[in-house]
Amino acid sequence: MVKKLNVQEMILTLQRFWSEKGCMLMQSYDTEKGAGTMSPYTFLRAIGPEPWNTAYVEPSRRPADGRYGENPNRLFQHHQFQVIMKPAPLNIQEFYLDSLRALGIDPLEHDIRFVEDNWENPSMGCAGVGWEVWLDGMEVTQFTYFQQVGGLQCDPVTSEITYGVERLASYIQDVDNVFDLEWGNGVLYGDIFKEPEYEHSKYAFEDSNQEMLLKFFDEYETEAKRLIDLGLVHPAYDYVLKCSHTFNLLDAHGAVSVTERAGYLSRIRRMAHSIAQAFVAEREKRGFPLLKHAQEAKTEVVDHD
C-alpha cells in the first residue's frame, strides 16, 4: 500500500532522490511561464555541449486551462517537478522507476506504462521523442529526450522528466479533487490555491485589458531584440517569457484570430532561436566552462583510483 505522503513530503522525497543521483537542486524561476521546460535552467542549459544535471519545482501558468477553481483537475496554475540530465544517462528510465519506489510505489505491484508521445513546443523551437508515463491508468509524468531546443540541435541529448505534481499527489493521496490534497501540516491545496485560481481565471477570461496586453507584447518584443543585440542573453530571455505569457493571456481571452495566432507564435520562436544562438556563442567564447569542470572532475576520480 502506498504511504499517503502530502505534497510537501512528496517534493522533498523527489528532491532528495535526484540530489543523490547528482542533480543540483535549483529554485523556481521568477518569471511567468507555461511549463518547466521554459525555465532557463532547462531551455538554455539543454543546448550546447556542457553537462547539466538539475531538479526543481516549477509553477506553470496556463491561462486557457483556468476553470475558476471549480474543476477538480484543470488549473490556471499547476506545478511540475522537473528533472534535467545532460547527457542523458543510459539508465535514466530505471532512475525514474527507482524514484517511484522512493515514493512508496512499487512498479511490480502497479500498472506502469510508457505510452509514446513525442513532444514539441513550436513557439520555442523545441521538439523531442518521448513518452507519457501512466500509473494505474493516470498520466503522471512526461519523459522526453530533447532533439531540438530554440531551433538548435541538442548534442549531447538531454533527458527531461516532468512529474505532474498535482496528478502524482492525487494518486498517492487517493483523492479525486486536487483541492482536497494535503499540501503540508494539515493545510489543504484548496486553502492555498482555490481563491487565486478563481481570480486568475476571472482575469484571464473576463477582465484582462486586451489593448494593454497587445501593447505590452510589442514592447516586450522590442526590448528582447534590443537586449539580444547588446549580448544580454538572460535579460532578453526574460522578455521572451513575458511575451509568451502575454500571448497566452490574449489567447485565453480570444483576442487573437487563428491567423494572428500563427504570427505571434512565429515572432516568439524567432526571438527564442536568436537567444539560443547567442547563449551557445557566449558559452563557447568562455570555453564552455562546465565542460572543462566535468573533465577535470573525471580526471581527479581517475587519479584517485
UniProtKB/Swiss-Prot annotation:
The keyword Protein biosynthesis applies. Its main location: cytoplasm. GO terms for cellular component: cytosol. SUPFAM superfamilies: Class II aaRS and biotin synthetases. It catalyses: tRNA(Gly) + glycine + ATP = glycyl-tRNA(Gly) + AMP + diphosphate. Pfam families: tRNA-synt_2e (PF02091). One of its GO terms (biological process) is glycyl-tRNA aminoacylation. Its EC number is 6.1.1.14. One of its GO terms (molecular function) is ATP binding. It comes from the Bacteria. The keyword Protein biosynthesis applies. PROSITE patterns: AA_TRNA_LIGASE_II_GLYAB. It is found in: Cytoplasm. Keywords: Aminoacyl-tRNA synthetase, ATP-binding, Cytoplasm, Ligase, Nucleotide-binding, Protein biosynthesis. Tetramer of two alpha and two beta subunits. Belongs to the class-II aminoacyl-tRNA synthetase family. NCBIfam families: glyQ, PRK09348.1. PANTHER family: GLYCINE--TRNA LIGASE, CHLOROPLASTIC_MITOCHONDRIAL 2, GLYCYL-TRNA SYNTHETASE. This is Glycine--tRNA ligase alpha subunit. It comes from Latilactobacillus sakei subsp. sakei (strain 23K). The gene is glyQ.
